[in-house]
């Protein structure tokens, strides 16, 4: 559960903080993934692609750090 404090009736900042916390906890991604049923084979493929993307990103970052 996500809790956000409202200070002095400032709804704009509260809404902004709420959206930021939702994004930080990957809430929107989970909602999007659960919208339709994903077969186990498609899930494995997607997770493998995400892992490969992370590895490429890490390799690129490591290459520029050296």
From Swiss-Prot:
Recorded coiled-coil stretches: none
Cellular component terms per the entry's GO annotation: ribonucleoprotein complex; ribosome
Gene3D superfamilies: Ribosomal protein S8 (1.20.5.1150)
Listed InterPro entries: Ribosomal_bS21 (IPR001911), Ribosomal_bS21_sf (IPR038380)
GO biological process: translation
Protein family according to the UniProt entry: Belongs to the bacterial ribosomal protein bS21 family.
Protein name (database record): Small ribosomal subunit protein bS21
